[in-house]
From Swiss-Prot:
This is Chaperone protein DnaK. Belongs to the heat shock protein 70 family. It comes from Vibrio harveyi. Residues 607-640 are annotated as: Disordered. Induction: By stress conditions e.g. heat shock.
Length: 640
C-alpha cells in the first residue's frame, strides 16, 4: 500500500503531512511554505491556488474570479441563515444551484463548493507527490468536529473530484489530539482541544489511555459552531475601518471592490500584528478617489479596540465548552491539558479567556497551524499499517433519527456516540391499510422535526394491508468510521427492504461527481498543454533573441543569402509563436536552427580566431615576463 497523506482542508489555510518513519512531517509547498492559503484564482488558461492565487486577487480582478473561505459553503443549502449572512460580506457571487445548494459563480459559470475545494486538495496532493517522488491516491482529510453529515459528505466528494481515495474523514480536534499525544508518556490524560480556525470552531474532550504501550484516543464529547472563525474576526475589523473612513472622507468603500480587497488584506495583517504589539497603523495610500482627488486611509488601531470589536465572538466560543464538559460528565478540574488549534488562537484575548475558563494555561508545544494535518498523517499511518499501537475512537457530533407521527424527531443514534455504530428500532404505520411509509432522516437535537437538519428521505413501498400499528418496519442506522450514514428500512413480514446512503437533500450525485472528476482530469491535461505551450514560446523567444545577436556579431562575415534565409526563418517562427500550436512552434525553432547553421560556423570560427589571437598575445607576454629587471650601480676603478 502506498503512502496515505493527511490533509487539513482549512477555511483560510490548508496543510499536508505524511508519516516519515514513525513521526508525522509537514510538507512544504512549491513556494516553500508549510501551509497553503485556501485561495483559488481562475485566470486565462490556468487555475492558481494559494499564494499565487492571492497575488492575482490583489493585482488583477479582485472579485469575479478569485474565491476564498469556500469551506463556509461546503455542504450547505442556499437558504441557510449562515449562507445568507455570507452573501452580504463575500466579494464573490454566491448563487442557488438547481438542487438548492449554495454554489459560487466564477468564469461565467456556476461551481459547486466541493468542486472549488477540490482545487486546494489537488495542490495538497501535488505537494505530497513532489516530496515523495511517487503518485499519491490515498488521503485522510479532516473536517470540523461539528460538521453535519452533509458537510462531511461534501468534503469527501471534494476529495474524489481531486483524484483522491478518501480513506477516512476525521474530526480536526481529534487529529490535533493524535499529533499531540502520539509521543507523550506518563499515563492517562484527559485533554480539551479548543480549535478556532478561519471559519469554524470546535471543542472536543478527549481521553488518552495507555495500556502496555498501546494508546487509545477516545472522544468523550464534542461541540462547536461551524460558522465562527477568524474570518468573522476579520470582518469586524474590516467594518470598523470602512466606517471610520466613511466618517472622515464621506466615502463608503463597500461600493469599491478593489478598495475592499486592499482593506481586507490590511485588516488581516493588522489583526496578526496586534497579537504581538499593542497598536498598529492601517496605512493605505490611494485607497480610492473622488472628484476632489485621491484619498488615503491612515487609521490607528489598538489591541484594546480590536478586543472590544470581537469580545462577543470570543464569548460565543465559551458556551460550547460548557456543553461539551456536561456531555462528557466532567468538570474543568478533570482536564489534564488544554490544546489550542487554529490560527485565531494566537490572539492573546482568546488565550486569556480559555485559560480563565479552564483555570490553566494552554500547552505551548503544539503548532496551531500544523497539528491537525500531522494528526491526519498519523491516522493515515494507522490505516496503512505503519502505526500499530494507536486506536482512535471518534464520535458523531449530532443525534440522528427519523421523523415520526406528530412531526416529532425520534432519535436512533444519540450525539457523542462512538463511531462506527449501528442502531435499529421497529416502527409501524399511522393509518389503516397503509401500503407505503416515508423515512425522513434528520440530524440535530430538537424534538420538533422541522427544527433539525434534513439529511434526506426515501419510501418503503409494498407493505401488506393491515390495521394501523400492526406492520413492523425495522429502521436501521449504520454510521461508518467517516461519520457517513447508511439507512435501511425493512418490512419484517414481507421481507421487502430499501437502503440508501444518506446524501444531503441536494448535494452532489455520483453523476455530478464523476462529471467533475472528468472536468478536473480535462483541466489537468489543459494545464499541462498550457505549460508546454508556454515553454515552447519561451524557447522560441530565446532562439530569436540569440540568433539576432549572432547575426549582428557576425557582421559582413555572414553572406547576404544566408542572412536572408535566417531572417525568413525568424519571421516564420515569430508568426508561429503567436499561435497556440506547440508542434508548429517546435518545428519553426528547428527550422531556424537549420537555417542558422552557417551562422554557427562563423561564430565558431570567430571564437577560435579570438582564442588564437589571445594565445599569441599571451606568448609574447610570457617572453617579456622572462626578462628580469635589475638595478645597476656603476663601479669606478680608481686604479689607473
Amino acid at each position: 500500500m502506498g503512502k496515505i497523506i493527511g490533509i487539513d482542508l482549512g477555511t483560510t489555510n490548508s496543510c499536508v503531512a505524511v508519516l516519515d518513519g514513525d513521526k508525522p512531517r509537514v510538507i512544504e509547498n512549491a513556494e516553500g511554505e508549510r501551509t497553503t492559503a485556501s485561495v483559488i484564482a481562475y485566470t486565462d488558461g490556468e487555475t492558481l491556488v494559494g499564494q499565487p492565487g492571492g497575488n492575482v486577487n490583489a493585482v488583477t480582478n479582485p472579485t469575479r474570479y478569485t474565491l476564498f473561505a469556500i469551506k463556509r459553503l461546503i455542504g450547505r443549502r442556499f437558504e441557510d441563515e449562515e449562507v445568507q449572512r455570507d452573501i452580504e460580506i463575500m466579494p464573490y457571487k454566491i448563487v442557488k444551484a438547481d438542487n438548492g445548494d449554495a454554489w459560487v459563480e466564477a468564469k461565467g459559470q456556476k461551481m459547486a463548493a466541493p468542486q472549488v475545494s477540490a482545487e486546494v486538495l489537488k495542490k495538497m496532493k501535488k505537494t505530497a507527490e513532489d516530496f515523495l517522488g511517487e503518485e499519491v491516491t490515498g488521503a485522510v482529510i479532516t473536517v470540523p468536529a461539528y460538521f453535519n453529515d452533509a458537510q462531511a459528505q461534501a468534503t469527501k466528494d471534494a476529495g474524489r473530484i481531486a483524484g483522491l481515495e478518501v480513506k477516512r474523514i476525521i474530526n480536526e480536534p481529534t487529529a490535533a489530539a493524535l499529533a499531540y499525544g502520539l509521543d507523550k508518556s506518563g499515563g492517562d490524560r484527559t485533554i480539551a482541544v479548543y480549535d478556532l480556525g478561519g471559519g469554524t470552531f470546535d471543542i472536543s474532550i478527549i481521553e488518552i489511555d495507555e495500556v502496555e504501550g498501546e494508546k487509545t484516543f477516545e472522544v468523550l464529547a464534542t461541540n462547536g459552531d461551524t460558522h465562527l472563525g477568524g474570518e468573522d474576526f476579520d470582518n469586524r475589523l474590516i467594518n470598523y475601518l470602512v466606517d471610520e473612513f466613511n466618517k472622515e472622507q464621506g466615502i463608503n468603500l463597500k461600493n469599491d471592490p478593489l478598495a475592499m480587497q486592499r482593506v481586507k488584506e490590511a485588516a488581516e495583517k493588522a489583526k496578526i500584528e496586534l497579537s504581538s504589539t499593542s497598536q498598529t497603523d492601517v496605512n493605505l495610500p490611494y485607497v480610492t478617489a473622488d472628484a476632489t482627488g485621491p484619498k488615503h486611509m491612515n487609521i490607528k488601531v489598538t489591541r484594546a479596540k480590536l478586543e472590544s470589536l470581537v469580545e462577543d465572538l470570543v464569548q460565543r466560543s465559551l458556551e460550547p465548552l460548557k456543553v461539551a464538559l456536561a456531555d462528557a460528565d466532567l468538570s474543568v478540574n478533570d482536564i489534564t491539558d488544554v490544546i489550542l488549534v487554529g490560527g485565531q488562537t494566537r490572539m492573546p484575548m482568546v488565550q486569556a479567556k480559555v485559560a480563565e475558563f479552564f483555570g490553566k494555561e494552554a500547552r505551548r508545544d503544539v503548532n496551531p497551524d500544523e497539528a491537525v494535518a500531522m494528526g491526519a498523517a498519523v491516522q493515515g499511518g494507522v490505516l496503512a499499517g505503519e502505526v500499530k499501537d494507536v486506536l482512535l475512537l471518534d464520535v458523531t457530533p449530532l443525534s440522528l433519527g427519523i421523523e415520526t407521527m406528530g412531526a416529532v424527531m425520534t432519535k436512533l443514534v444519540e450525539k457523542n456516540t462512538t463511531i462506527p455504530t449501528k442502531a435499529n428500532q421497529v416502527f409501524s404505520t399511522a393509518e389503516d391499510n397503509q401500503s407505503a411509509v416515508t423515512i425522513h432522516v434528520l440530524q440535530g437535537e430538537r424534538k420538533q422535526a422541522s427544527f433539525n437538519k434534513s439529511l434526506g428521505q426515501f419510501n418503503l413501498e409494498g407493505i401488506q394491508a393491515a390495521p394501523r400499528g400492526m406492520p413492523q418496519i425495522e429502521v436501521t442506522f449504520d454510521l461508518d468510521a467517516d461519520g457517513i450514514l447508511h439507512v435501511s428500512a425493512k418490512d419484517k413480514q414481507t421481507g421487502k427492504e430499501q437502503k440508501i446512503t444518506i446524501q444531503a437533500s441536494g448535494g452532489l450525485s455520483d453523476d455530478d461527481i464523476e462529471k467533475m472528476v472528468q472536468e478536473a482530469e480535462a483541466n489537468k491535461e489543459a494545464d499541462k498543454k498550457f505549460e508546454e505551450l508556454a515553454t515552447a514560446r519561451n524557447q522560441a523567444d530565446q532562439m530569436i533573441h540569440g540568433t539576432r545577436k549572432q547575426v549582428e556579431e557576425a557582421g559582413e562575415a555572414l553572406p547576404a543569402e544566408e542572412k536572408e534565409k535566417i531572417e525568413a526563418a525568424i519571421s516564420e517562427l515569430e508568426t508561429a509563436r503567436k499561435g497556440d500550436d506547440k508542434e508548429a512552434i517546435d518545428a519553426k525553432v528547428q527550422a531556424l536552427m537549420t537555417a542558422a547553421q552557417k551562422l554557427m560556423e562563423i561564430a565558431q570560427q570567430q571564437a577560435q580566431a579570438q582564442q588564437a589571437q589571445g594565445g599569441y598575445a599571451g606568448a609574447q607576454q610570457s617572453q617579456e615576463d622572462d626578462v628580469v629587471d635589475a638595478e645597476f650601480e656603476e663601479v669606478k676603478d680608481d686604479k689607473k
